[in-house]
Amino acid sequence: MSKRGARTPGYWYDNTPIPLPARMLAPVYGAVTAVRRSLYRRGWLKRHGVPVPVVVIGNVTAGGTGKTPLTITLVSRLQQAGWTPGVASRGYGRDDAGTARWVDADTPVALGGDEPVLIAWKTGARVRVDTDRLAAARALVEAGCDIIVCDDGLQHYRLARDVEIEVVDGQRRYGNGRMLPAGPLREPAARARECDFRVVNLGQGSDAVIPAVATPVADTDAGFGEWQMRLSIDSVQPMDGKRARPLASLAGQRVHAVAGIAHPERFFAMLRARGIGVVPHAFPDHHVYRAQDFSFGSRLPVLMTEKDAVKCRPFADEWLYSVPLKAELPAAFWVSLLDRLDKLASRHSDA
C-alpha cells in the first residue's frame, strides 16, 4: 500500500501514549479557544448576519468527517425545493489563499481548492472562496442567492448563522476527547450540544438500517437529534468522457484505488465490499497530483474519489475513473431541516 505524507496521529484515536509536547500545548489551545468563544458569546466580538438564512456545516474535530458529500447533497436538495443556494468556503489548499474568488466547475483546483471545485461541478451552484466567510456570504447574497451554505464554518463565529449541522465520524467520534494537538478536538465535545442537527457518518454501511427518526445521544445532544448518514457508491465514471458504467462490472477484478482524503481506508473498504480487488494508494488530504503519481508499474484501472478526480482532469486518460459518492439520510431529516428553513425564510423576509 502506497503511503505518502502526514497522517492523523494514532494517539488521537487509540491508547498510544500522547507525546509530552502535545500534552503541554493542548491546555493552551483549549484556553485560547474558550476565550475566543466567550468573547463572541458576550458580544465583545461581534457577529454579523446576512439577510438570508445561513446553514453552517462543520465539525468539532479536526480532519474529514464527510462534510463535502453532505454539502453537495444539501445544496442539491435545496435546489430541488426551489431555493437558490450559494456555498461559502475557505478553499483549503489553494494557491494564494488570501484572494477571494468565484469558483465554477472549470476553475483550476490550484485557484479554487479541490472541495469548492467539486461542489461547483456537482451542483452548478454559486461558490465563493474566501478566508472571511462573512465576506463570502455577502458576495453570494449580492449575486442573487437566497440561502447560504457555509462549508466547514462551525468555528467561524464572525458569520451569524441560523442552523448548525455537526458532522461526526461514526467510528471515531471524538477520539480520546482531548483538545488539539493532544487529541482531535477543535472545541470541547460539549460544543456539539449547541448544534441544531448532528449527522453521523456511518461510511459505507451498506447493510446498516438508517432509522427514520433521530437518535438522541446522552451528554452531547444536538437540538434536533442525531441522524445517521450512509455513503453509497454504485457506478464509475471514465475520466476520458465516456459513459458511466456500473461499479458491479468491476467485481472480481483488481484495480488501483487512489484516495487523497482524510480517511482513505474508508474508500478502499467501500470498493472491497463490492467485490473489487483493491491495490490501495493513499495520498495526503488535498494532495496535488501529477501524472507520475500514477506510475504504479501495472496497467490496471485506476479508481479514485471525485475529490481526487477534479485534480486529475488535465492528464486524465482511459485508465482513470472517478467514483461518485452519494450521501443518504432519512427522509425525516430533510423534512425537519427544510421545514425549519422555510420558517427562517419567512422570518428573514419580515425583518
UniProtKB/Swiss-Prot annotation:
Reactions catalysed: a lipid A disaccharide + ATP = a lipid IVA + ADP + H(+)
GO CC, alphabetical: plasma membrane
Pathway connected to this protein: Glycolipid biosynthesis; lipid IV(A) biosynthesis; lipid IV(A) from (3R)-3-hydroxytetradecanoyl-[acyl-carrier-protein] and UDP-N-acetyl-alpha-D-glucosamine: step 6/6
Pfam family, one: LpxK
Entry EC number(s): 2.7.1.130
Binding site residues for ATP: 61-68
Record keywords: ATP-binding, Kinase, Lipid A biosynthesis, Lipid biosynthesis, Lipid metabolism, Nucleotide-binding, Transferase
GO biological process, one term: lipid A biosynthetic process
GO molecular function: ATP binding; tetraacyldisaccharide 4'-kinase activity
Name of the top EC class for this enzyme: transferase
PANTHER family tied to this protein: TETRAACYLDISACCHARIDE 4'-KINASE, TETRAACYLDISACCHARIDE 4'-KINASE, MITOCHONDRIAL-RELATED
Job of this protein: Transfers the gamma-phosphate of ATP to the 4'-position of a tetraacyldisaccharide 1-phosphate intermediate (termed DS-1-P) to form tetraacyldisaccharide 1,4'-bis-phosphate (lipid IVA).
Family: Belongs to the LpxK family.
Name used for this protein in its record: Tetraacyldisaccharide 4'-kinase
Organism: Xanthomonas campestris pv. campestris (strain B100)
UniProt lineage: Bacteria, Pseudomonadati, Pseudomonadota, Gammaproteobacteria, Lysobacterales
Name of the encoding gene: lpxK
